[in-house]
Swiss-Prot record:
The protein's name: Glycerol-3-phosphate dehydrogenase, mitochondrial
Family: Belongs to the FAD-dependent glycerol-3-phosphate dehydrogenase family.
Cofactor: FAD
List of residues binding Ca(2+): 672, 674, 676, 678, 683
Organism this protein belongs to: Macaca fascicularis (Crab-eating macaque)
PROSITE patterns for this protein: EF_HAND_1 (PS00018), EF_HAND_2 (PS50222), FAD_G3PDH_1 (PS00977), FAD_G3PDH_2 (PS00978)
Domain of life: Eukaryota
Residue range covered by the transit peptide: 1-42
UniProt record, GO biological process: glycerol catabolic process; glycerol-3-phosphate metabolic process; NADH metabolic process
NADP as UniProt keyword: no
Annotated control of activity: Calcium-binding enhance the activity of the enzyme.
């Protein structure tokens, strides 16, 4: 009883405090709203993009080389860096951007895919009366509304259910979520509401039923993060920014200011990672927007600069779509160690995450088995015991590095800033660090404001509120129907193209190959179970894709959805890219191997493989072992103790099934632990044991052998009189 009173008191005090804050901030909020309206009007009157399509990478490199001096040079092609380039170029500043890898190759493509204000930050704002947290939530909610508006094809509101298992939590969480709606104000997506236990189970039938009291549903935004980042960069390029991926900054250029006598940063020495060519790019102002690599650029400027980035790894996993409703997510507000776990539908799959672990900065973060199992255990806690959560159902996993920062100007150097930090060095290098995906635009605005002030640049106000990103302006929810009717694409593919490219989907459809079937007329898929088509590979090159990794992870999202499917699609993707980019056989093989290494280490294939290669005792019942041995010996007719491609082909031919030899080789290679071109009986039994345990969700070889066995067993012996053996 005392505890319940304490909870009520906390709600009343916290709510009252926030109401006071809200009251005091109304005038400021009104002023900001008027300013934002002015910005939207400015965006309406902004000149059309100078380029109908983004210039080619080669054209961008020539611009970088031949421009005597830019106003702004941005280092980093993530969400914040691309946002800075777009903000600067739409103010009329001569802008350049360089990225040493691909756009969104780092943290910006490895997020939870949410556009949110941060419910947990609001909770802290109330409980600790923290005005900074409150302002951060309010800013994020405004930016959430803007992002959903300017890229409607890549983003949408998503209802998220918060299950409640204790009666006293229901009013506590309800007050918190209603305050979230209140802080959003006119930017509230949809009003939150309470569900009874029965209604909660109707919406989310896989929820843990025992002790469930009810649930609260609130709304946040969801997006395709890598494609959103790319849309920002492409929009900046269309407005005239010279943007180039695979351009590494090897050093900063400096010169002495004749008026002040101070040494100032005046550009960067850049290296084309693809060719090795180096040249200088000069600029009045250089912006460091490199996320987790913030300190490495700061130390180029000043080798004694104190580190401000405190990197933290966040791991996510992808599971089959049946683990969650198609259009509703779940929030676990208090995990076993106090963290928050999201469980969300995305691209017809289910994302679960995230973790929060201190880590070292690396361009190639690897998801750990420990973090994967932590997420799986938390998922088990919230799902019904009828749903068997298996390790083998993890189809992909990734780790993203959060660039948490300390403010170098703060007296307390140990405190981590929950908001972004704009730092200006003695030599004029501007660093933007911290923050989160949702607030990339306001971070960019603050950064360019600082650049204009520090370097006396002539520019107008920010014009990016209400400015449509590439593909968003003429998109509509029914656009995909025109793709079906005008081009003969199947509906699933058309919906995917519309949701990925927006009004640019027609250009992809024009490139689609004829299928040779009655229906669909065009649109050859890269893999049968996903709606990605070959035309996207060709179009992806127009979007600055330079490698096979770019294509499987950021132009399409195959690597983030299913690593096995991505590996299956790789040979065809490399073949198509090779034709467009004139790759020789050596280059194609190099691209194939690099992409497989990426899938193996960075996208969770390594952890998946280790579940299969675990040499622990085979745990199968004797009856199962006998059954699987019989299946194996139908292929191993010579009793060699192993099977090869020849054995599989022989059985398939006997049941009139044709299969490409390269595909067969890939299927056997998945199970061939010794990599000797043979699948031994012990390897096959390990595979079946791993499938039964749930370590591995399935295997193409296991499915193939089972299907072949069933076909062989269904054969009816031909009677003697039907075989001309009788009179």
């Amino acid at each position: 009883m005392a505890f319940q009173k304490a909870v009520k008191g906390t709600i009343l005090v916290g709510g009252g405090a926030l109401a006071t804050v809200l009251g005091l901030s109304q005038f400021a909020h009104y002023r900001r709203k008027q300013m934002n309206l002015a910005y939207v009007k400015a965006a309406d009157y902004i000149s059309e993009p100078v380029n109908r399509e983004p210039p080619s990478r080669e054209a961008q490199l020539l611009t970088l080389q031949n421009t005597s001096e830019f106003d702004i040079l941005v280092i980093g092609g993530g969400a914040t860096g691309s946002g800075c380039a777009l903000d600067a170029v739409t103010r009329g500043l001569k802008t350049a951007l360089v990225e040493r890898d691909d756009f969104s190759s780092g943290t910006s493509s490895r997020s939870t895919k949410l556009i949110h204000g941060g419910v947990r930050y609001l909770q802290k704002a109330i409980m600790k009366l923290d005005i900074e947290q409150y302002r951060m939530v309010k800013e994020a909610l405004h930016e959430r509304a803007n992002l959903l508006e300017i890229a409607p094809h890549l983003s949408a509101p998503l209802p998220i259910v918060l299950p409640v298992y204790k009666w006293w939590q229901l009013p506590y969480y309800w007050v918190g979520i209603k305050l979230y709606d209140l802080v959003a104000g006119s930017n509230c997506l949809k009003s939150s509401y309470v569900l009874s236990k029965s209604r909660a189970l109707e919406h989310f039938p896989m929820l843990q039923k025992d002790k469930l009291v009810g649930a609260i549903v609130y709304y946040d935004g969801q997006h395709n993060d890598a494609r959103m980042n790319l849309a920002i960069a492409l929009t900046a390029a269309r407005y005239g920014a010279a943007t180039a991926n695979y351009m590494e900054v090897v050093s900063l250029l400096k010169k002495t200011d004749p008026q002040t006598g101070k040494v100032r940063v005046s550009g960067a020495r850049c290296k084309d990672v693809l060719t090795g060519q180096e040249f200088d790019v000069r600029a009045k102002c250089v912006i460091n927007a490199t996320g987790p690599f913030t300190d490495s650029v700061r130390k180029m400027d000043d080798k004694d600069a104190a580190a401000i980035c405190q990197p933290s790894a966040g791991v996510h996993i992808v599971m089959p779509g049946y683990y969650s409703p198609e259009s509703m997510g779940l929030l676990d507000p208090a995990t076993s160690d106090g963290r928050v776990i999201f469980f969300l539908p995305w691209q017809k799959m289910t994302i679960a995450g995230t973790t929060d672990t201190p880590t070292d900065v690396t361009p190639h973060p690897i998801p750990s088995e420990e973090d994967i199992n932590f997420i799986l255990n938390e998922v088990r806690n919230y799902l019904s015991c009828d749903v068997e959560v298996r390790r083998g159902d993890v189809l992909a996993a990734w780790s993203g590095i959060r660039p948490l920062v300390t403010d170098p100007k703060s007296a307390d150097t140990q405190s981590i800033s929950r908001n972004h930090v704009v730092d200006i060095s003695e030599s004029g290098l501007i660093t933007i660090a911290g923050g989160k995906w949702t607030t990339y635009r306001s971070m960019a605005e603050d950064t360019i404001n600082a650049a204009i002030k520090t370097h006396n640049l002539k520019a107008g106000p920010s014009r990016t509120v209400g400015l449509f990103l590439q593909g968003g302006k003429d998109w509509s929810p029914t656009l995909y129907i025109r793709l079906v009717q005008d081009y003969g694409l199947e509906s699933e593919v058309a919906q995917h193209l519309a949701a990925t490219y927006g009004d640019k989907a027609f250009e992809v459809a024009k490139m689609a190959s004829v299928t040779g079937k009655r229906w669909p007329i065009v649109g050859v898929r890269l893999v049968s179970e996903f709606p990605y088509i070959e035309a996207e590979v060709k179009y992806g090159i127009k979007e600055y894709a330079c490698t096979a990794v770019d294509m499987i992870s950021r132009r399409t999202r195959l690597a983030f959805l299913n690593v096995q499917a991505a590996e299956e699609a790789l040979p065809r993707i490399v073949e198509l890219m090779g034709r467009e980019l004139n790759w020789d056989d050596h280059k194609k093989q190099e691209q194939l191997e690099t992409a497989k290494k990426f899938l193996y280490y960075e996208m969770g294939y390594k952890s998946r493989s280790e579940q299969l290669t675990d040499r622990s005792e085979i745990s199968l019942l004797p009856s199962d072992i006998d059954r699987y041995k019989k299946r194996f010996h139908k292929f191993d007719a010579d009793k060699k103790g192993f099977i090869t491609i020849v054995d599989v082909q022989r059985v398939l031919e006997s049941i009139n099934v044709q299969m490409d030899e390269n595909t067969l080789h890939e299927i056997l290679n998945e199970v061939d632990l010794n990599k000797n071109g043979q699948v031994e009986l012990n390897e096959f039994l390990q595979l079946m044991s791993a499938i039964q345990k749930g370590r591995v969700s399935g295997s193409r070889l296991a499915i193939l052998m089972k299907t072949a066995e069933e076909n062989l067993d269904r054969r009816v012996p031909i009677p003697v009189d039907r075989s001309c053996g009788g009179l």
